[in-house]
From Swiss-Prot:
Role this protein plays: Flavoenzyme involved in polyamine back-conversion. Catalyzes the oxidation of the secondary amino group of polyamines, such as spermine. Substrate preference is spermine > thermospermine > norspermine. No activity detected when putrescine, spermidine or N(1)-acetylspermidine are used as substrates. Plays an important role in the regulation of polyamine intracellular concentration.
Cofactor: record remark: Binds 1 FAD per subunit.
Name this protein carries in UniProt: Polyamine oxidase 4
Organism of this sequence: Oryza sativa subsp. japonica (Rice)
Superkingdom per UniProt: Eukaryota
Sample GO molecular function, one term: thermospermine oxidase activity
Length: 487
C-alpha cells in the first residue's frame, strides 16, 4: 500500500457523499492529543471541524521542547504499555518513532524497574544493590498487605494510612536506617505515578488501573511527531480561550475570551480536568448535577519536571539516579536521558505537594534546589548550561498534570465524566476509565467521542452513516513494528 494513501493521524476513513446543503459541523475545544485525534477522525469523515486551542501551540500537556537542540518532553514522555494492543502503537510504528523501554511488566515502581539505577544517601554514599533489592521485596509485601486491609474496610482510606496499619500488624516489615530511607524512595516513586502524595491516594482504587503489557517506554524522539501528524491539515485556531458554551436543541455556540463566537452542530470538550474544575468555562444552561459532580469527584495530580542540559556527562551510565531520605519528600529522582537518547540531559521529577512548592520558585531557584541534591550525590557535578522548568499546576491552560484516584472516588465517576450532555461530548485522559493519566488513554477517548458524536449527528440529520472507522491497529500488516531498545 502506498503510504501516501494513508490519512495522516491513524484513521483511514472514506469520504462521505453528503446529500445535504452543508456538511455536519463540530467544534473541538482543546488541541491536545485527545482533541486533535477527535478532530482528525471527524475531518476524515467529511465533517466541518474547528479546533479551538487556548495556547499558542498544539499538544496541550504533551509538550516537546527543542531549545536544548534535542527533543525534551516537558509533559507526557512515556508510552505506558509497549505492545500492539496500545492504541498509539500502530501510529508510532508507522511514523518510525523509537522507544526506550524503562521497565518490563508488573514492576512495583511502574515506569521503572531496578535494573539500571544508582541510589545515594545524603552523604553521597551509594546504596548497595543488595539493600535496594531487599527493600523492593519488602515494599511489594507491604503493598500486598494493603489489599487485605482494603478487603476489610467498608469505606475508602488513604493508601498511606493503610501502609501504617500494615506496619502496625506486621512489625517485622518495619525498616530502620538506610533500609527505611530506600523504602521512602519507593513511596516517592509511587507518588510520582499518581502525581499525588500517599495520604491523598485512594486505597480502593490505587491498583485498579488496567495496565497494558509490555512495560513502559520513553519516546526517544519526543511525543510531538504524533501531535504533528494528527494535526496536519486541520483547522486549528490558536490563542482562543473558551469562556462560554451555550447549547441549544439544534446546535451549540462557543464564545472565546476575545468575544469571538463559533457555532456548530455539536461540541467535543477535551480541555484538562483542572480547567473544568476551576469553572473557567461557563455552560448555558448549566451542566446537570450528575455531570458537575463527576467533574468535582475526580482528582487532579501535579507532577513537574526540571530538565537540565550539561556540557559533560559526569554521572553514572544508569537510567535512574536517586537520593534516598527519611521521608518521601526528602527523596529525589533524576531521569538520565543520556542513557536513553544520547543527549547530556538529566530530568528531575517532583510530584504532589512538592511539585506545588516547586512552582512557587523561580526557574533558577528550582534548578539550584535540585542541583543541591545532585551535588550531595555526585560532588563533582557541574552546573547546567541550559534548563527548563514546568509548572503544570499553575498554568491556566492545564491547572494540573493529570487525573488521579483520590480517597472516596465513586466507582462510576469516569463513566459519568465521559458521558455526553445532549450535543456536548467529553474526552481526554480523565474520561478514560481504564487508562486515565496516559497519552493513549487520551487518544482513545478522543476517537471514541468523535465516533459517538458522528453517529448521533448523522442520525439526527437523517444521513446514512457510511463510515467504517479504521484505526491503524486494523492495518498492522502494512505498519512497521515498534522500534524498542534498552542498552
Amino acid at each position: 500500500m502506498d503510504p501516501n494513501s494513508l490519512k495522516t493521524g491513524g484513521l483511514l476513513l472514506p469520504t462521505i457523499e453528503r446529500q445535504c446543503a452543508s456538511p455536519p459541523s463540530v467544534i473541538v475545544i482543546g488541541g491536545g492529543i485527545s482533541g486533535v485525534a477527535a478532530a482528525r477522525a471527524l475531518s476524515n469523515a467529511s465533517f466541518e471541524v474547528t479546533v479551538l486551542e487556548s495556547r499558542d501551540r498544539v499538544g496541550g500537556r504533551v509538550h516537546t521542547d527543542y531549545s536544548f537542540g534535542c527533543p525534551i518532553d516537558m509533559g507526557a514522555s512515556w508510552l505506558h504499555g509497549v505492545c500492539n494492543e496500545n492504541s498509539l502503537a500502530p501510529l508510532i510504528g508507522y511514523l518510525g518513532l523509537k522507544l526506550y523501554r524503562t521497565s518490563g511488566d508488573n514492576s512495583v515502581l511502574y515506569d521503572h524497574d531496578l535494573e539500571s539505577y544508582a541510589l545515594f544517601d545524603k552523604a553521597g554514599h551509594q546504596v548497595s544493590k543488595e539493600t535496594v533489592a531487599k527493600v523492593e521485596e519488602t515494599f511489594e509485601r507491604i503493598l500486598d498487605e494493603t489489599v487485605k486491609v482494603r478487603d476489610e474496610q467498608e469505606h475508602d482510606m488513604p493508601l498511606l494510612q493503610a501502609i501504617s496499619l500494615v506496619l502496625e500488624r506486621h512489625p517485622h516489615l518495619k525498616l530502620q536506617g538506610i533500609d527505611d530511607q530506600v523504602l521512602q524512595w519507593c513511596v516517592c516513586r509511587l507518588e510520582a505515578w499518581f502525581a499525588a502524595d500517599a495520604d491523598e491516594i485512594s486505597l480502593k482504587n490505587w491498583d485498579q488501573e488496567h495496565v497494558l503489557t509490555g512495560g513502559h517506554g520513553l519516546m526517544v524522539n519526543g511525543y510531538y511527531p504524533i501531535i504533528q501528524a494528527l494535526a496536519q491539515g486541520l483547522d486549528i485556531r490558536l490563542n482562543q480561550r473558551v469562556t462560554k458554551i451555550a447549547r441549544q436543541f439544534n446546535g451549540v455556540t462557543v464564545t472565546t475570551e476575545d468575544g469571538t463566537s463559533y457555532s456548530a452542530d455539536a461540541c467535543i470538550i477535551t480541555v484538562p480536568l483542572g480547567v473544568l474544575k476551576a469553572n473557567i468555562i461557563k455552560f448555558e444552561p448549566e451542566l446537570p448535577s450528575w455531570k458537575s459532580s463527576a467533574i468535582a469527584d475526580l482528582g487532579v495530580g501535579i507532577e513537574n519536571k526540571i530538565a537540565m542540559h550539561f556540557d559533560t556527562v559526569f554521572w553514572p551510565n544508569v537510567e535512574v539516579l536517586g537520593m534516598v531520605g527519611p521521608t518521601p519528600k526528602a527523596c529525589g529522582y533524576f531521569l538520565n536521558l543520556h542513557k536513553a537518547t544520547g543527549n547530556p540531559v538529566l530530568v528531575y521529577m517532583a510530584a504532589g505537594r512538592f511539585a506545588q512548592e516547586v512552582e512557587k520558585l523561580s526557574d533558577k531557584e528550582a534548578v539550584d534546589l535540585v542541583m543541591s541534591h545532585l551535588k550531595k550525590m555526585l560532588p563533582d557535578a557541574t552546573e547546567p548550561t541550559k534548563y527548563l522548568v514546568s509548572r503544570w499546576g499553575s498554568d491556566p491552560n492545564s491547572l494540573g498534570s493529570y487525573s488521579c484516584d483520590l480517597v472516596g472516588k465513586p466507582a462510576d465517576v469516569s463513566a459519568r465524566f465521559a458521558a455526553p450532555v445532549e450535543n456536548l461530548y467529553f474526552a481526554g485522559e480523565a474520561a478514560s476509565a481504564d487508562h486515565s493519566g496516559s497519552v493513549h488513554g487520551a487518544y482513545s477517548s478522543g476517537i471514541a467521542a468523535a465516533d459517538e458524536c458522528r453517529k448521533r449527528i448523522l442520525m439526527q440529520k437523517g444521513i446514512p452513516d457510511l463510515v467504517q472507522v479504521k484505526a491503524y491497529e486494523e492495518m498492522a500488516g502494512v505498519i512497521a513494528p515498534l522500534q524498542i531498545c534498552r542498552t
